[in-house]
Design a protein with these regions (language model features):
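Thiamine diphosphate
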Residues: 667-677
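Short Gly/aromatic-enriched secondary-structure transition segments
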Residues: 647-649
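Residues forming the flavin
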Residues: 1-629, 635, 640, 652-665, ...
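C-terminal functional segments of enzyme domains
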Residues: 730-760
């Protein structure tokens, strides 16, 4: 049996199915006929009906696939044939090179295939029948079409994702026209089907990260910086005087070597430089850190440099392309950006990925159709399950004659991986992702369970049922006006809650027909399996850290934390009661909202310290030759990609703006804004974040918005005009809007005149 899955089609369903499977320990080939995997999304601005930014919603999927060595992305590639049996299939594919050279054939060994091909709107052309590509694909897959032009189902149980050929599953547009949210759910369900089939081979032959032996680097070591400048593609390499830029960069403090390279992304120049052991910091100048930072961090790690000692300077999208009409001006700005990059990399410290052991079992609350389907699917994926249900729910499942439900009771009773808790109710939950401690109130003695994930499939099995129950409070659950639990991660994650490791499906989230309820449960099983398929989880070290010496226990940071990662701790220190914030490393997402609320510098985010922001601001303004000078803070999720979008489209805007990337707009402390204006002499400060409702940190942009009033009052105290500070919501697709905002703010600041606090 082969631990590989071939996913046909890299649309939203294909990417989601692929991302699910690589997280669960499978190798994935993501095959796309077109030249790029996100090809159609450039034409989509916002998603209906939630009005989410399409590019912002897509970004996490792209990063998951780009940054996972077990995801093999095959673009400009078509399937020619599929032979063999489920678990041991051979797929022949044709990868196109160009029109003159033709293509090259390749044979892939896979255990299963997920068909996630999309659909296109009719262009008014004449066709013999709709779905004109389906017949050819069906023949290559060894399938037949039904009278509606869809793939024939497995006749044994009529499951909508199972085709007549075992080991070949279908989701997305392959099922017909379907809404985005439903397509995502079906993609997760299809992934669970493939994972169940290939359980015996899971994790076999995976590309595992090599054990790193990084050069020892201490924070106090004098920086020895190597700089690699990527010349870029033909459209950018002549827009900057790169020789002049390299000479200038060589003169900056701590820079010991600068190299120009035609393409830094292959990693060879980085490995040659860093591999000598002569350098303890690295700057890659050229590509955007989104989505390239993960790639260059891997190159750094392969050369034995801690990946968090890397800084990226965005010359292509945020300098060359947006100032292409004036090469000299663009080159001067590039020098400033390099200076800012050096200022930041000098302050970086080596960090280690965080690894936590987890409990590889799942609690499913509710014996609804979705709950039972979820429990059965998890068990078939090799994961231990505790199913909390009631006698009426069990009876209803047993009495059903529906072909999808009828086999479920027997599968439950025959599985060694499922423990059913009948007529029990979940009273409370403590802990967090990977290690929840749950109390069951059941006939006889109460029972305490330890699980790694929780799936809600019904509201009926929750003690005290209504809003405000201990479980709802501990898991931060919220109900809508109809009494269903609200999923809070947007249309791309209908089954996810704000609290990581807790998922929503079936009767807990909405009313569903039987077939859809089964898919909902299977999809939730896939989401939980992404956590539970490994005995440990690895998290980014870019999280908050409490400075006990500075923290006075004011608790200003506690309530604003969107993940409830902070609590107040009291203890006796030197015969006195000491209060200090205590931090949960597992649940922290590094948004920095806590850092921006602290008046005493008692907490900071690793890799994004306040001092680093301040130093970059000083450097940007010290080297600035353009007036008025604008410091622009952009969040990584939406606004920074939005600025990149302006570069991709070649939209011009004034070179007076210098962009500084932050994790979230909510991490920018008001003092940074005021200091930039009153001490460093910026003419204006622009803070760009996600649109409300699209914030990865849930509330970060709302916190930033709430602080604008305080910033306005501080500006008034310093006799500065309110126009010198501006907050804007920029989606990842809104490059035109970003450029327009820069134009408008530059005009406003020009009318106001120079900042009176500018000492130069």
């Amino acid at each position: 049996m082969t631990n590989s899955v071939l996913v046909l089609g890299a649309g939203i369903a294909g990417m989601r199915a692929a991302a699910e499977l690589v997280q669960q320990g499978f190798e994935v080939y993501l095959l796309e006929k077109k030249s790029r995997i996100d090809n159609n999304w450039e034409s989509i601005d916002h998603l209906f009906p939630t009005d989410e930014c399409a590019a912002c919603s897509l970004q996490p999927l792209l990063l998951e696939l780009f940054n996972n060595a077990n995801a093999k992305i095959l673009t400009s590639t078509e399937l020619l044939s599929l032979r063999g049996q489920a678990g041991d299939l051979t797929a022949e594919v044709l990868k196109e090179k160009d029109e003159d050279k033709g293509g090259s054939k390749e044979v892939l060994s896979v255990g299963a295939v997920i068909v996630a091909t999309g659909q296109e709107e009719d262009k008014g052309e004449t066709h013999e029948h709709l779905g004109y590509g389906m017949q050819a694909l069906a023949e290559r897959l060894g399938l037949e079409l039904d009278d509606k032009g869809n793939f024939k189902r497995d006749l044994e149980n009529g499951h909508p994702l199972l085709t007549a050929r075992k080991g070949v599953f279908v989701c997305g547009g392959g099922l017909g026209p379907i809404k985005i949210g439903e397509s995502v759910v079906r993609a997760c369900a299809a992934a669970s089907q493939a994972a169940s089939l290939l359980v015996p081979a899971k994790r076999n032959g995976l590309t595992k990260p090599e054990e790193n032996h990084f050069f020892p680097v201490k924070a106090e070591d004098e920086p020895r910086i190597a700089v690699v400048i990527d010349q870029g593609d033909a459209d950018v390499k002549d827009l900057l005087d790169l020789d002049e830029l390299a000479t200038y960069t060589q003169s900056l403090p701590g820079v010991e070597q600068v190299e120009l390279t035609a393409r830094a992304s292959d990693g060879s120049s980085i490995k040659d430089l860093i591999g000598t052991g002569d350098f303890n910091r690295l700057i890659v100048a050229g590509p955007s850190p989104i989505p390239h930072e993960g790639l260059f961090q891997r190159h750094a790690a392969e050369a034995d440099l801690n990946p968090y000692l890397l800084e990226m300077v965005n010359l292509h999208n945020q300098c060359a392309r947006v100032h292409s009409s004036d090469r000299k001006q663009a080159t001067e700005k590039a020098k400033t950006l390099m200076n800012m990059g050096v200022a930041r990399v000098r302050q970086l410290e080596p960090l280690e990925e965080l690894k936590f052991d987890i409990t590889q079992s799942c609690l499913v609350i509710g014996g609804s159709i979705s709950g039972v389907a979820c429990a059965v699917r998890l068990a078939e994926m090799g994961i231990n399950v505790h199913l909390v249900t009631s006698s009426p729910e069990q009876e209803k499942i047993r009495e059903s004659d529906h072909p999808l439900i009828k086999p479920l009771p027997a599968k439950l009773s025959n599985s060694e991986n499922v423990i059913v808790h009948t007529d029990a109710a979940v009273e409370d939950s403590q802990g967090c992702l990977g290690n929840f401690i749950v109390t069951l109130n059941q006939p006889g003695e109460p029972e305490t369970l330890k699980v790694g994930a929780i799936v809600l499939a019904s509201a009926m099995s929750i003690e005290k049922g209504g809003d405000g129950s201990p479980l709802e409070e501990s898991l931060a659950l919220e109900k809508d006006s109809d009494g269903f639990y609200k999923s809070t991660q947007g249309i791309m994650n209908l089954l996810d809650f704000t609290t990581e490791g807790v998922f929503n499906c079936g009767a807990a989230r909405t009313a569903l027909e039987i077939e859809v309820a089964v898919l909902d449960g299977e999809a939730a099983a896939s989401r939980a399996a992404c956590i539970l398929s490994s005995p440990s989880i690895t998290r980014s070290p870019v999280i908050s850290l409490v400075v006990n010496e500075n923290c006075d226990g004011c608790a200003y940071c506690i309530d604003p934390c969107p993940t409830r990662s902070l609590t107040l701790l009291e203890y006796v220190h030197r015969s006195a009661v000491k209060k200090v914030a205590e931090h949960n490393k597992v649940t922290c997402i590094g948004c920095g909202i806590c850092m921006s609320t602290c008046p005493k510098k008692g907490i900071f985010v690793k890799h994004f310290r306040l001092e680093t922001f301040s130093e970059m601001v000083k450097t940007a303004l010290k080297a600035s030759d353009f007036q008025p000078s604008i410091i622009c803070f952009c969040c990584s999720r939406c606004a920074y990609p939005g600025a990149d979008a302006a570069g991709s489209m070649g939209i011009q805007y004034p070179a007076s703006v210098k962009i500084i990337r932050s994790v979230c707009s909510g991490m920018i402390h008001p003092n940074i804004v005021i200091d930039a204006l009153t001490q460093d002499g910026a003419d204006g400060v622009l803070l760009c974040g996600c649109h409300p409702g699209n914030c990865r940190s849930r509330e970060g942009v709302l916190k930033a918005q709430a602080r604008t009033e305080a910033i306005d009052l501080m500006l008034e105290d310093f006799a500065l005009e309110p126009e010198r500070f501006r907050l804007e919501f920029i989606a990842a697709s809104e490059g035109k809007k970003f450029a327009k905002v820069i134009e408008e703010m530059t005009e406003e600041l020009s009318a106001l005149g120079p900042n009176p606090y500018n000492k130069t």
